[in-house]
């Protein structure tokens, strides 16, 4: 799945994919969000699908938002290999570029730059991803002793 640069005129929306028990259970284009919905103990996100734009709430499971390809004049350094699981099944592996990840306080997730490989999430170029939810990810630093 390749998502175009979100700053381009022919903008492609970011894509939200959620997993439970090792299976993809939800895939929608993101219009707005995600936001923490403190009253419902869930996440709230505005999505677009064949029925138009609407808000959805969800909690649990592991979710990934592919926020699109990142264009850098200088190639960032490969720093980590991150394997993510839902249930006991590996659903995606990220080759993480750059040392910094940022914490998204709304959804208690992490934003990072990576190439992805998996059965439902894959990119040959560096994309920005937001990873959140209750999946397990195991990271291995590249080039560290």
Curated annotation (Swiss-Prot):
It comes from the Bacteria. This is Uncharacterized protein sll1613. It comes from Synechocystis sp. (strain ATCC 27184 / PCC 6803 / Kazusa).
């Amino acid at each position: 799945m390749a998502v175009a640069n979100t700053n381009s005129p022919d903008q492609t929306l970011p894509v939200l994919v959620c997993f439970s028990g090792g299976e993809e259970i939800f895939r929608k284009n993101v219009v707005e969000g995600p936001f923490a919905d403190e009253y419902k103990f869930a996440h709230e996100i505005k999505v677009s699908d064949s029925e138009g734009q609407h808000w959805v709430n969800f909690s649990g499971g592991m979710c990934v938002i592919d926020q699109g390809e990142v264009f850098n004049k200088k190639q960032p350094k490969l720093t980590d290999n991150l394997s993510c699981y839902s249930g006991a099944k590996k659903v995606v592996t990220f080759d993480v570029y750059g040392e910094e990840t940022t914490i998204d306080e709304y959804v208690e997730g992490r934003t990072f730059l990576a190439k992805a490989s998996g059965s439902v999430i894959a990119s040959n170029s560096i994309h920005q991803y937001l990873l959140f939810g209750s999946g397990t990810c195991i990271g291995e630093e590249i080039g560290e002793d």
